[in-house]
From Swiss-Prot:
Species the sequence originates in: Homo sapiens
The name this protein goes by in its record: PHD finger protein 19
Record-linked InterPro entries: KDM4-like_Tudor, Mtf2_C_dom, PHF19_PHD2, Tudor, Tudor_PHF19, Zinc_finger_PHD-type_CS, Znf_FYVE_PHD, Znf_PHD
TM annotation in the entry: none
Location(s) in or outside the cell: Nucleus
Modified residues (Phosphoserine): S13, S187, S365, S366
Gene behind the chain: PHF19
Region (Histone H3K36me3 binding), start-end ranges: 74-80
GO molecular function, one term: chromatin binding
One GO term (biological process): stem cell population maintenance
Length: 580
Protein backbone atom coordinates (compact mmCIF):
# COMPACT_ATOMS: atom_id res chain seq x y z
CA UNK A 1 0.00 0.00 0.00
CA UNK A 2 1.36 3.36 -0.98
CA UNK A 3 1.63 5.82 1.90
CA UNK A 4 1.71 9.51 1.19
CA UNK A 5 2.81 11.95 3.84
CA UNK A 6 0.18 12.83 6.40
CA UNK A 7 0.33 16.58 6.36
CA UNK A 8 1.27 18.18 9.70
CA UNK A 9 -1.39 20.78 9.09
CA UNK A 10 -4.25 18.29 9.11
CA UNK A 11 -7.29 20.20 10.27
CA UNK A 12 -10.78 19.65 11.60
CA UNK A 13 -12.21 21.98 8.97
CA UNK A 14 -12.26 21.76 5.21
CA UNK A 15 -9.23 23.77 4.22
CA UNK A 16 -8.37 27.37 4.79
CA UNK A 17 -10.88 30.10 4.13
CA UNK A 18 -9.19 31.04 0.89
CA UNK A 19 -9.76 27.54 -0.44
CA UNK A 20 -13.47 27.35 0.34
CA UNK A 21 -15.90 27.53 -2.57
CA UNK A 22 -17.04 31.02 -3.45
CA UNK A 23 -20.33 31.48 -1.54
CA UNK A 24 -21.55 33.97 -4.11
CA UNK A 25 -21.01 31.39 -6.82
CA UNK A 26 -22.86 28.79 -4.77
CA UNK A 27 -25.79 31.17 -4.31
CA UNK A 28 -25.91 31.73 -8.06
CA UNK A 29 -25.92 27.99 -8.58
CA UNK A 30 -28.98 27.64 -6.36
CA UNK A 31 -30.82 30.58 -7.92
CA UNK A 32 -30.28 29.44 -11.51
CA UNK A 33 -30.49 25.72 -10.89
CA UNK A 34 -34.00 25.23 -12.21
CA UNK A 35 -33.48 27.54 -15.17
CA UNK A 36 -30.32 25.67 -16.10
CA UNK A 37 -31.86 22.24 -15.77
CA UNK A 38 -34.90 23.23 -17.80
CA UNK A 39 -32.63 22.64 -20.80
CA UNK A 40 -32.85 18.92 -20.12
CA UNK A 41 -35.35 17.51 -22.58
CA UNK A 42 -36.72 14.08 -23.40
CA UNK A 43 -34.62 12.16 -25.89
CA UNK A 44 -31.43 14.03 -24.95
CA UNK A 45 -28.23 12.01 -24.43
CA UNK A 46 -26.43 12.84 -21.19
CA UNK A 47 -23.65 11.56 -18.94
CA UNK A 48 -24.89 10.42 -15.52
CA UNK A 49 -22.71 10.22 -12.44
CA UNK A 50 -23.37 6.92 -10.61
CA UNK A 51 -22.86 5.71 -7.04
CA UNK A 52 -19.44 4.25 -7.91
CA UNK A 53 -18.13 7.65 -9.02
CA UNK A 54 -18.07 6.70 -12.71
CA UNK A 55 -20.04 8.30 -15.55
CA UNK A 56 -22.46 6.38 -17.77
CA UNK A 57 -24.14 7.41 -21.01
CA UNK A 58 -27.92 7.49 -20.97
CA UNK A 59 -30.97 8.90 -22.71
CA UNK A 60 -33.56 11.02 -20.91
CA UNK A 61 -37.06 9.52 -20.99
CA UNK A 62 -38.84 11.85 -18.61
CA UNK A 63 -38.10 15.09 -16.74
CA UNK A 64 -39.61 15.74 -13.30
CA UNK A 65 -39.41 19.29 -11.93
CA UNK A 66 -40.91 18.28 -8.58
CA UNK A 67 -38.26 15.61 -8.01
CA UNK A 68 -35.52 17.64 -9.72
CA UNK A 69 -34.51 14.47 -11.51
CA UNK A 70 -34.77 12.69 -14.84
CA UNK A 71 -35.74 9.14 -15.74
CA UNK A 72 -32.78 7.90 -17.76
CA UNK A 73 -32.44 4.75 -19.88
CA UNK A 74 -28.90 3.38 -19.98
CA UNK A 75 -27.14 1.23 -22.55
CA UNK A 76 -28.11 -2.01 -20.79
CA UNK A 77 -31.80 -0.97 -21.04
CA UNK A 78 -32.02 -0.31 -17.30
CA UNK A 79 -33.98 2.74 -16.15
CA UNK A 80 -33.21 4.89 -13.11
CA UNK A 81 -34.14 8.29 -11.76
CA UNK A 82 -31.05 10.53 -11.68
CA UNK A 83 -30.87 13.86 -9.86
CA UNK A 84 -30.21 16.93 -11.97
CA UNK A 85 -26.99 17.63 -10.06
CA UNK A 86 -25.60 14.29 -11.27
CA UNK A 87 -26.38 14.84 -14.97
CA UNK A 88 -23.77 16.27 -17.34
CA UNK A 89 -25.12 17.60 -20.63
CA UNK A 90 -23.33 19.12 -23.60
CA UNK A 91 -23.50 22.64 -24.90
CA UNK A 92 -25.41 23.60 -28.02
CA UNK A 93 -23.11 24.16 -31.04
CA UNK A 94 -23.23 27.71 -32.40
CA UNK A 95 -24.87 29.15 -29.29
CA UNK A 96 -23.55 32.42 -27.90
CA UNK A 97 -21.07 31.69 -25.07
CA UNK A 98 -22.47 32.17 -21.58
CA UNK A 99 -21.60 31.03 -18.09
CA UNK A 100 -23.17 27.75 -17.05
CA UNK A 101 -23.24 28.96 -13.42
CA UNK A 102 -24.48 32.55 -13.42
CA UNK A 103 -25.92 32.42 -16.98
CA UNK A 104 -24.14 35.72 -17.68
CA UNK A 105 -22.72 36.53 -21.10
CA UNK A 106 -20.38 39.37 -20.22
CA UNK A 107 -16.66 38.96 -19.62
CA UNK A 108 -14.14 41.05 -17.72
CA UNK A 109 -10.47 41.17 -16.81
CA UNK A 110 -9.45 37.85 -15.21
CA UNK A 111 -13.07 36.78 -15.48
CA UNK A 112 -13.47 35.64 -19.05
CA UNK A 113 -15.89 32.95 -20.15
CA UNK A 114 -13.93 29.76 -20.79
CA UNK A 115 -15.36 27.04 -23.02
CA UNK A 116 -14.76 23.47 -21.90
CA UNK A 117 -12.92 21.43 -24.52
CA UNK A 118 -15.08 18.36 -23.84
CA UNK A 119 -18.67 19.34 -23.01
CA UNK A 120 -18.67 22.74 -24.76
CA UNK A 121 -20.20 24.57 -21.79
CA UNK A 122 -18.91 28.00 -20.73
CA UNK A 123 -17.78 29.13 -17.27
CA UNK A 124 -16.61 32.44 -15.87
CA UNK A 125 -13.16 32.09 -14.38
CA UNK A 126 -14.45 33.33 -11.01
CA UNK A 127 -17.59 31.19 -11.12
CA UNK A 128 -15.75 27.95 -11.71
CA UNK A 129 -14.73 25.87 -8.66
CA UNK A 130 -11.82 26.15 -8.16
CA UNK A 131 -11.15 29.52 -9.80
CA UNK A 132 -9.79 28.90 -13.28
CA UNK A 133 -6.49 30.40 -14.37
CA UNK A 134 -5.09 31.34 -10.96
CA UNK A 135 -1.42 32.16 -10.51
CA UNK A 136 -0.54 28.73 -9.12
CA UNK A 137 -2.70 26.87 -11.63
CA UNK A 138 -2.29 28.17 -15.20
CA UNK A 139 -4.85 27.34 -17.85
CA UNK A 140 -4.37 24.24 -19.94
CA UNK A 141 -5.00 24.02 -23.65
CA UNK A 142 -7.61 22.75 -24.16
CA UNK A 143 -9.26 23.74 -20.90
CA UNK A 144 -11.64 21.31 -19.15
CA UNK A 145 -14.30 22.14 -16.57
CA UNK A 146 -14.48 20.47 -13.15
CA UNK A 147 -17.05 17.86 -14.18
CA UNK A 148 -15.18 16.87 -17.30
CA UNK A 149 -11.92 16.54 -15.36
CA UNK A 150 -13.59 13.91 -13.19
CA UNK A 151 -15.16 12.24 -16.22
CA UNK A 152 -11.74 12.01 -17.89
CA UNK A 153 -9.70 10.94 -14.85
CA UNK A 154 -11.84 8.58 -12.76
CA UNK A 155 -11.29 4.85 -13.22
CA UNK A 156 -12.46 1.65 -11.61
CA UNK A 157 -9.78 0.82 -9.06
CA UNK A 158 -8.55 4.40 -8.73
CA UNK A 159 -8.18 7.60 -10.72
CA UNK A 160 -5.25 8.51 -12.98
CA UNK A 161 -2.00 9.22 -11.13
CA UNK A 162 0.26 10.49 -13.91
CA UNK A 163 -0.07 13.10 -16.62
CA UNK A 164 -1.61 16.55 -17.01
CA UNK A 165 -5.16 15.32 -16.34
CA UNK A 166 -4.03 13.63 -13.09
CA UNK A 167 -2.29 16.80 -11.90
CA UNK A 168 -5.35 18.88 -12.73
CA UNK A 169 -7.57 16.41 -10.88
CA UNK A 170 -5.38 16.72 -7.79
CA UNK A 171 -5.72 20.51 -7.91
CA UNK A 172 -9.49 20.27 -8.37
CA UNK A 173 -9.81 17.89 -5.41
CA UNK A 174 -8.32 20.47 -3.05
CA UNK A 175 -11.64 22.35 -3.08
CA UNK A 176 -15.12 20.87 -2.67
CA UNK A 177 -17.97 22.12 -4.83
CA UNK A 178 -20.43 22.00 -1.91
CA UNK A 179 -20.60 23.13 1.70
CA UNK A 180 -20.02 20.00 3.84
CA UNK A 181 -21.52 21.57 6.96
CA UNK A 182 -24.88 21.84 5.18
CA UNK A 183 -25.18 18.09 4.63
CA UNK A 184 -27.70 16.27 6.84
CA UNK A 185 -26.22 12.98 8.01
CA UNK A 186 -27.71 9.98 9.77
CA UNK A 187 -26.41 9.07 13.24
CA UNK A 188 -23.67 6.62 12.06
CA UNK A 189 -22.56 9.26 9.51
CA UNK A 190 -22.97 6.93 6.54
CA UNK A 191 -25.67 8.53 4.40
CA UNK A 192 -26.91 12.09 3.95
CA UNK A 193 -30.19 13.52 2.72
CA UNK A 194 -28.60 15.39 -0.18
CA UNK A 195 -26.93 12.26 -1.64
CA UNK A 196 -23.72 14.27 -1.90
CA UNK A 197 -20.39 12.51 -1.34
CA UNK A 198 -16.76 12.59 -2.37
CA UNK A 199 -14.87 15.32 -4.22
CA UNK A 200 -17.24 15.02 -7.16
CA UNK A 201 -20.38 15.65 -5.11
CA UNK A 202 -22.13 12.63 -6.63
CA UNK A 203 -24.19 9.84 -5.05
CA UNK A 204 -22.58 6.94 -3.22
CA UNK A 205 -23.10 3.78 -1.18
CA UNK A 206 -20.85 3.50 1.89
CA UNK A 207 -21.07 -0.30 1.96
CA UNK A 208 -19.61 -0.75 -1.53
CA UNK A 209 -16.26 0.67 -2.67
CA UNK A 210 -15.85 3.87 -0.67
CA UNK A 211 -13.29 5.25 1.78
CA UNK A 212 -14.20 7.34 4.81
CA UNK A 213 -11.89 10.18 5.76
CA UNK A 214 -10.78 9.77 9.35
CA UNK A 215 -10.83 13.54 9.93
CA UNK A 216 -13.95 14.92 8.23
CA UNK A 217 -15.82 11.54 8.03
CA UNK A 218 -16.97 12.20 4.46
CA UNK A 219 -17.09 9.19 2.11
CA UNK A 220 -15.04 9.09 -1.10
CA UNK A 221 -15.37 6.88 -4.17
CA UNK A 222 -12.62 4.44 -4.97
CA UNK A 223 -12.74 5.73 -8.56
CA UNK A 224 -12.00 9.32 -7.47
CA UNK A 225 -9.02 8.59 -5.21
CA UNK A 226 -5.42 8.55 -6.42
CA UNK A 227 -3.76 6.79 -3.47
CA UNK A 228 -4.75 3.14 -4.05
CA UNK A 229 -2.34 0.60 -5.48
CA UNK A 230 -4.88 -2.23 -5.53
CA UNK A 231 -8.62 -2.14 -6.28
CA UNK A 232 -10.87 -2.20 -3.23
CA UNK A 233 -13.13 -5.02 -2.11
CA UNK A 234 -16.80 -4.33 -1.43
CA UNK A 235 -17.28 -3.09 2.12
CA UNK A 236 -13.55 -3.03 2.88
CA UNK A 237 -13.07 -0.33 5.53
CA UNK A 238 -9.73 -1.51 6.89
CA UNK A 239 -7.97 1.69 5.89
CA UNK A 240 -6.75 4.80 7.66
CA UNK A 241 -7.54 7.50 5.09
CA UNK A 242 -7.23 11.29 4.95
CA UNK A 243 -8.71 13.13 1.98
CA UNK A 244 -6.85 15.79 -0.01
CA UNK A 245 -8.87 18.59 1.59
CA UNK A 246 -8.03 17.55 5.14
CA UNK A 247 -4.41 16.68 4.31
CA UNK A 248 -3.93 19.87 2.26
CA UNK A 249 -2.29 17.87 -0.49
CA UNK A 250 -2.19 14.32 -1.83
CA UNK A 251 -4.31 11.79 0.03
CA UNK A 252 -2.84 9.77 2.88
CA UNK A 253 -3.75 6.08 3.22
CA UNK A 254 -2.58 3.22 5.41
CA UNK A 255 -3.75 -0.39 5.40
CA UNK A 256 -4.98 -1.73 8.76
CA UNK A 257 -4.19 -5.33 9.76
CA UNK A 258 -6.86 -8.00 9.30
CA UNK A 259 -7.47 -11.16 11.32
CA UNK A 260 -8.75 -14.42 9.88
CA UNK A 261 -12.24 -13.69 11.10
CA UNK A 262 -12.15 -10.36 9.22
CA UNK A 263 -10.89 -12.08 6.07
CA UNK A 264 -13.69 -14.64 5.99
CA UNK A 265 -16.26 -11.96 6.91
CA UNK A 266 -15.10 -9.79 4.02
CA UNK A 267 -15.14 -12.78 1.66
CA UNK A 268 -18.70 -13.75 2.64
CA UNK A 269 -19.89 -10.17 2.24
CA UNK A 270 -18.36 -9.84 -1.23
CA UNK A 271 -19.80 -13.18 -2.31
CA UNK A 272 -23.22 -12.04 -1.14
CA UNK A 273 -23.00 -8.74 -3.02
CA UNK A 274 -21.91 -10.41 -6.25
CA UNK A 275 -24.18 -13.47 -6.34
CA UNK A 276 -27.19 -12.41 -4.22
CA UNK A 277 -27.10 -15.77 -2.41
CA UNK A 278 -27.28 -16.28 1.34
CA UNK A 279 -25.36 -19.50 1.97
CA UNK A 280 -21.99 -20.41 0.50
CA UNK A 281 -20.10 -23.67 0.57
CA UNK A 282 -16.77 -23.58 2.40
CA UNK A 283 -14.92 -24.61 -0.76
CA UNK A 284 -16.46 -21.62 -2.54
CA UNK A 285 -15.33 -19.31 0.26
CA UNK A 286 -11.80 -20.74 0.20
CA UNK A 287 -11.60 -20.42 -3.59
CA UNK A 288 -12.70 -16.77 -3.38
CA UNK A 289 -10.06 -15.94 -0.76
CA UNK A 290 -7.29 -17.65 -2.72
CA UNK A 291 -8.32 -15.91 -5.95
CA UNK A 292 -8.33 -12.46 -4.30
CA UNK A 293 -5.38 -13.08 -2.00
CA UNK A 294 -3.32 -10.15 -3.32
CA UNK A 295 -6.27 -7.74 -3.34
CA UNK A 296 -6.95 -8.46 0.34
CA UNK A 297 -3.54 -6.97 1.30
CA UNK A 298 -3.27 -9.01 4.47
CA UNK A 299 0.12 -7.84 5.68
CA UNK A 300 1.68 -10.49 7.91
CA UNK A 301 -0.94 -13.05 6.86
CA UNK A 302 0.17 -12.76 3.22
CA UNK A 303 2.93 -15.33 3.75
CA UNK A 304 0.47 -18.01 4.90
CA UNK A 305 0.84 -21.12 2.68
CA UNK A 306 -2.14 -22.12 0.57
CA UNK A 307 -2.49 -25.39 2.48
CA UNK A 308 -2.79 -23.58 5.82
CA UNK A 309 -5.43 -21.05 4.78
CA UNK A 310 -8.37 -23.47 4.81
CA UNK A 311 -8.01 -24.54 8.48
CA UNK A 312 -7.68 -20.92 9.61
CA UNK A 313 -10.80 -19.86 7.71
CA UNK A 314 -12.83 -22.86 8.88
CA UNK A 315 -11.79 -22.27 12.47
CA UNK A 316 -12.94 -18.64 12.26
CA UNK A 317 -16.30 -19.69 10.77
CA UNK A 318 -16.92 -22.22 13.53
CA UNK A 319 -15.60 -20.09 16.37
CA UNK A 320 -17.29 -16.73 15.85
CA UNK A 321 -20.96 -17.66 16.11
CA UNK A 322 -21.78 -14.01 16.63
CA UNK A 323 -20.91 -13.30 12.99
CA UNK A 324 -21.51 -16.48 11.02
CA UNK A 325 -24.40 -18.92 10.77
CA UNK A 326 -23.68 -22.53 9.89
CA UNK A 327 -26.16 -24.54 7.86
CA UNK A 328 -26.18 -27.14 10.63
CA UNK A 329 -28.04 -24.71 12.88
CA UNK A 330 -31.03 -24.72 10.53
CA UNK A 331 -30.78 -28.44 9.75
CA UNK A 332 -28.95 -27.98 6.47
CA UNK A 333 -25.47 -29.04 5.39
CA UNK A 334 -22.84 -28.26 8.00
CA UNK A 335 -20.33 -27.10 5.38
CA UNK A 336 -22.35 -24.05 4.25
CA UNK A 337 -22.17 -20.66 5.95
CA UNK A 338 -23.64 -17.18 5.76
CA UNK A 339 -23.43 -13.90 7.64
CA UNK A 340 -25.87 -13.54 10.50
CA UNK A 341 -26.31 -9.88 9.57
CA UNK A 342 -25.41 -8.84 6.06
CA UNK A 343 -23.09 -5.93 6.82
CA UNK A 344 -19.39 -5.45 6.05
CA UNK A 345 -16.89 -6.02 8.86
CA UNK A 346 -16.03 -3.13 11.14
CA UNK A 347 -12.37 -2.17 11.45
CA UNK A 348 -11.26 -2.30 15.09
CA UNK A 349 -11.27 1.22 16.47
CA UNK A 350 -8.44 0.34 18.86
CA UNK A 351 -6.00 0.30 15.92
CA UNK A 352 -6.89 3.84 14.83
CA UNK A 353 -5.03 6.84 16.23
CA UNK A 354 -6.69 9.33 18.55
CA UNK A 355 -7.84 12.42 16.69
CA UNK A 356 -6.42 14.53 19.49
CA UNK A 357 -2.92 13.29 18.68
CA UNK A 358 -3.04 14.56 15.12
CA UNK A 359 -1.19 17.86 14.60
CA UNK A 360 -3.28 20.96 14.14
CA UNK A 361 -3.01 23.90 11.86
CA UNK A 362 -1.45 26.18 14.46
CA UNK A 363 1.43 23.86 15.33
CA UNK A 364 4.96 24.93 14.52
CA UNK A 365 5.36 21.85 12.37
CA UNK A 366 2.78 23.15 9.90
CA UNK A 367 5.67 24.86 8.14
CA UNK A 368 6.95 21.42 7.16
CA UNK A 369 3.94 20.76 4.93
CA UNK A 370 4.60 18.07 2.35
CA UNK A 371 2.95 18.03 -1.06
CA UNK A 372 4.40 14.93 -2.70
CA UNK A 373 5.31 11.33 -1.92
CA UNK A 374 7.08 11.11 1.38
CA UNK A 375 7.97 8.46 3.87
CA UNK A 376 6.25 8.45 7.26
CA UNK A 377 9.67 9.18 8.78
CA UNK A 378 9.51 12.72 7.39
CA UNK A 379 6.82 13.64 9.89
CA UNK A 380 7.87 15.73 12.92
CA UNK A 381 9.98 13.60 15.28
CA UNK A 382 7.90 14.16 18.42
CA UNK A 383 4.64 13.37 16.64
CA UNK A 384 6.09 10.22 15.12
CA UNK A 385 7.28 8.93 18.50
CA UNK A 386 3.97 9.68 20.16
CA UNK A 387 2.07 8.05 17.31
CA UNK A 388 4.20 4.89 17.55
CA UNK A 389 3.70 4.60 21.32
CA UNK A 390 -0.06 4.98 21.08
CA UNK A 391 -0.28 2.58 18.15
CA UNK A 392 1.77 -0.10 19.93
CA UNK A 393 -0.28 0.26 23.10
CA UNK A 394 -3.58 0.01 21.24
CA UNK A 395 -2.42 -2.88 19.10
CA UNK A 396 -1.15 -4.90 22.09
CA UNK A 397 -4.40 -4.29 23.94
CA UNK A 398 -6.40 -5.31 20.89
CA UNK A 399 -4.40 -8.51 20.39
CA UNK A 400 -4.72 -9.39 24.07
CA UNK A 401 -8.48 -8.94 24.01
CA UNK A 402 -8.72 -10.90 20.79
CA UNK A 403 -6.83 -13.78 22.41
CA UNK A 404 -9.39 -13.90 25.25
CA UNK A 405 -12.63 -12.82 23.57
CA UNK A 406 -16.10 -13.12 25.01
CA UNK A 407 -18.18 -16.27 24.93
CA UNK A 408 -20.54 -16.99 22.06
CA UNK A 409 -23.51 -14.67 22.28
CA UNK A 410 -25.91 -17.51 21.60
CA UNK A 411 -24.99 -19.08 24.93
CA UNK A 412 -24.03 -16.19 27.22
CA UNK A 413 -26.20 -13.31 28.32
CA UNK A 414 -23.30 -10.87 28.72
CA UNK A 415 -21.92 -11.12 25.19
CA UNK A 416 -23.58 -8.07 23.58
CA UNK A 417 -21.69 -5.59 25.72
CA UNK A 418 -18.44 -7.56 25.68
CA UNK A 419 -18.38 -8.06 21.90
CA UNK A 420 -19.11 -4.39 21.38
CA UNK A 421 -16.14 -3.42 23.56
CA UNK A 422 -13.69 -5.82 21.85
CA UNK A 423 -14.67 -5.74 18.20
CA UNK A 424 -16.24 -2.26 17.92
CA UNK A 425 -19.46 -3.61 16.47
CA UNK A 426 -22.21 -1.09 15.87
CA UNK A 427 -25.74 -1.73 17.06
CA UNK A 428 -26.89 -2.90 13.64
CA UNK A 429 -24.23 -5.61 13.66
CA UNK A 430 -25.08 -7.26 16.97
CA UNK A 431 -28.25 -9.25 17.38
CA UNK A 432 -29.81 -8.40 20.70
CA UNK A 433 -30.39 -11.33 23.00
CA UNK A 434 -34.04 -11.82 23.80
CA UNK A 435 -33.02 -13.21 27.17
CA UNK A 436 -30.83 -10.25 28.17
CA UNK A 437 -31.10 -8.95 31.71
CA UNK A 438 -33.39 -5.96 32.12
CA UNK A 439 -31.76 -4.15 34.98
CA UNK A 440 -28.82 -5.98 36.54
CA UNK A 441 -25.29 -6.31 35.21
CA UNK A 442 -23.54 -9.68 35.47
CA UNK A 443 -20.11 -10.93 34.46
CA UNK A 444 -19.30 -14.28 32.90
CA UNK A 445 -16.46 -16.50 34.03
CA UNK A 446 -13.01 -15.53 32.76
CA UNK A 447 -12.58 -18.97 31.24
CA UNK A 448 -15.37 -18.45 28.69
CA UNK A 449 -14.19 -17.66 25.17
CA UNK A 450 -15.81 -16.54 21.96
CA UNK A 451 -14.43 -19.63 20.31
CA UNK A 452 -16.43 -21.92 22.58
CA UNK A 453 -19.09 -23.62 20.52
CA UNK A 454 -20.48 -26.21 22.90
CA UNK A 455 -23.92 -27.39 21.99
CA UNK A 456 -24.86 -29.15 25.23
CA UNK A 457 -27.20 -27.58 27.76
CA UNK A 458 -27.01 -27.59 31.52
CA UNK A 459 -29.59 -29.55 33.48
CA UNK A 460 -30.28 -28.55 37.06
CA UNK A 461 -32.71 -29.74 39.70
CA UNK A 462 -34.99 -26.92 40.82
CA UNK A 463 -36.46 -27.52 44.27
CA UNK A 464 -39.88 -26.11 45.09
CA UNK A 465 -38.97 -25.15 48.66
CA UNK A 466 -36.23 -22.68 47.67
CA UNK A 467 -33.29 -25.05 48.13
CA UNK A 468 -31.40 -23.33 45.29
CA UNK A 469 -28.12 -24.82 44.15
CA UNK A 470 -25.17 -22.83 42.87
CA UNK A 471 -25.43 -21.94 39.16
CA UNK A 472 -23.14 -23.46 36.57
CA UNK A 473 -21.24 -20.19 36.11
CA UNK A 474 -19.34 -18.31 38.81
CA UNK A 475 -20.78 -14.86 39.31
CA UNK A 476 -19.78 -11.89 41.37
CA UNK A 477 -22.17 -10.42 43.90
CA UNK A 478 -23.27 -6.85 43.60
CA UNK A 479 -21.59 -4.48 46.02
CA UNK A 480 -24.60 -4.34 48.34
CA UNK A 481 -24.84 -8.14 48.45
CA UNK A 482 -21.36 -8.90 49.81
CA UNK A 483 -21.43 -10.81 53.12
CA UNK A 484 -20.56 -8.92 56.30
CA UNK A 485 -17.56 -10.35 58.15
CA UNK A 486 -19.69 -11.43 61.13
CA UNK A 487 -22.08 -13.30 58.85
CA UNK A 488 -19.17 -15.12 57.23
CA UNK A 489 -17.94 -16.32 60.62
CA UNK A 490 -21.40 -17.55 61.63
CA UNK A 491 -21.86 -19.25 58.30
CA UNK A 492 -18.48 -20.97 58.64
CA UNK A 493 -19.42 -22.28 62.11
CA UNK A 494 -22.79 -23.55 60.94
CA UNK A 495 -21.53 -24.88 57.62
CA UNK A 496 -20.67 -28.33 58.98
CA UNK A 497 -24.14 -28.75 60.50
CA UNK A 498 -26.17 -27.63 57.48
CA UNK A 499 -27.42 -30.37 55.14
CA UNK A 500 -27.61 -29.64 51.44
CA UNK A 501 -29.49 -31.40 48.68
CA UNK A 502 -27.70 -32.48 45.55
CA UNK A 503 -28.87 -31.64 42.06
CA UNK A 504 -30.12 -34.11 39.49
CA UNK A 505 -26.60 -34.26 38.09
CA UNK A 506 -25.09 -35.06 41.47
CA UNK A 507 -23.37 -31.71 41.93
CA UNK A 508 -23.24 -30.65 45.57
CA UNK A 509 -23.22 -27.15 47.02
CA UNK A 510 -19.65 -25.90 47.59
CA UNK A 511 -18.53 -25.66 51.18
CA UNK A 512 -17.14 -22.14 50.87
CA UNK A 513 -19.78 -19.68 52.12
CA UNK A 514 -18.76 -17.07 49.50
CA UNK A 515 -19.87 -19.22 46.60
CA UNK A 516 -23.14 -20.58 47.86
CA UNK A 517 -25.10 -20.99 51.12
CA UNK A 518 -28.17 -23.13 51.63
CA UNK A 519 -31.19 -21.16 52.72
CA UNK A 520 -31.50 -23.25 55.90
CA UNK A 521 -28.08 -22.02 57.03
CA UNK A 522 -29.75 -18.95 58.47
CA UNK A 523 -32.57 -20.69 60.36
CA UNK A 524 -30.68 -20.52 63.65
CA UNK A 525 -29.68 -16.92 63.18
CA UNK A 526 -31.87 -14.19 64.61
CA UNK A 527 -34.01 -12.56 61.95
CA UNK A 528 -33.88 -9.31 63.90
CA UNK A 529 -30.61 -8.49 62.17
CA UNK A 530 -31.72 -6.52 59.10
CA UNK A 531 -28.41 -6.98 57.30
CA UNK A 532 -28.62 -10.76 57.60
CA UNK A 533 -32.21 -10.70 56.38
CA UNK A 534 -31.19 -8.70 53.33
CA UNK A 535 -28.16 -10.96 52.84
CA UNK A 536 -30.31 -14.08 52.91
CA UNK A 537 -32.73 -12.75 50.31
CA UNK A 538 -30.00 -11.38 48.05
CA UNK A 539 -27.99 -14.63 48.01
CA UNK A 540 -31.11 -16.73 47.50
CA UNK A 541 -32.13 -14.59 44.55
CA UNK A 542 -28.66 -14.35 43.06
CA UNK A 543 -27.12 -17.81 43.01
CA UNK A 544 -28.49 -20.92 41.32
CA UNK A 545 -31.74 -21.08 39.42
CA UNK A 546 -33.12 -17.83 40.86
CA UNK A 547 -30.19 -15.88 39.48
CA UNK A 548 -30.52 -17.48 36.08
CA UNK A 549 -34.25 -16.73 36.01
CA UNK A 550 -33.57 -13.13 37.02
CA UNK A 551 -31.16 -12.85 34.11
CA UNK A 552 -33.94 -13.94 31.79
CA UNK A 553 -32.17 -17.14 30.76
CA UNK A 554 -34.48 -19.47 28.84
CA UNK A 555 -35.30 -22.89 30.26
CA UNK A 556 -37.48 -25.93 29.67
CA UNK A 557 -39.06 -28.16 32.35
CA UNK A 558 -38.27 -31.80 31.49
CA UNK A 559 -39.71 -33.67 34.49
CA UNK A 560 -41.47 -33.34 37.85
CA UNK A 561 -41.23 -35.57 40.93
CA UNK A 562 -42.34 -35.73 44.56
CA UNK A 563 -39.76 -36.95 47.09
CA UNK A 564 -40.64 -39.26 50.05
CA UNK A 565 -40.46 -36.15 52.24
CA UNK A 566 -43.24 -34.58 50.18
CA UNK A 567 -41.04 -32.06 48.38
CA UNK A 568 -41.85 -31.21 44.76
CA UNK A 569 -38.80 -31.04 42.46
CA UNK A 570 -38.43 -30.18 38.78
CA UNK A 571 -35.76 -31.18 36.26
CA UNK A 572 -34.94 -28.05 34.27
CA UNK A 573 -32.88 -27.73 31.08
CA UNK A 574 -31.19 -24.34 30.77
CA UNK A 575 -30.34 -22.66 27.47
CA UNK A 576 -26.83 -21.70 28.59
CA UNK A 577 -23.76 -23.90 28.72
CA UNK A 578 -21.73 -25.12 31.67
CA UNK A 579 -18.03 -26.02 31.89
CA UNK A 580 -18.77 -28.76 34.43
Amino acid sequence: MENRALDPGTRDSYGATSHLPNKGALAKVKNNFKDLMSKLTEGQYVLCRWTDGLYYLGKIKRVSSSKQSCLVTFEDNSKYWVLWKDIQHAGVPGEEPKCNICLGKTSGPLNEILICGKCGLGYHQQCHIPIAGSADQPLLTPWFCRRCIFALAVRKGGALKKGAIARTLQAVKMVLSYQPEELEWDSPHRTNQQQCYCYCGGPGEWYLRMLQCYRCRQWFHEACTQCLNEPMMFGDRFYLFFCSVCNQGPEYIERLPLRWVDVVHLALYNLGVQSKKKYFDFEEILAFVNHHWELLQLGKLTSTPVTDRGPHLLNALNSYKSRFLCGKEIKKKKCIFRLRIRVPPNPPGKLLPDKGLLPNENSASSELRKRGKSKPGLLPHEFQQQKRRVYRRKRSKFLLEDAIPSSDFTSAWSTNHHLASIFDFTLDEIQSLKSASSGQTFFSDVDSTDAASTSGSASTSLSYDSRWTVGSRKRKLAAKAYMPLRAKRWAAELDGRCPSDSSAEGASVPERPDEGIDSHTFESISEDDSSLSHLKSSITNYFGAAGRLACGEKYQVLARRVTPEGKVQYLVEWEGTTPY
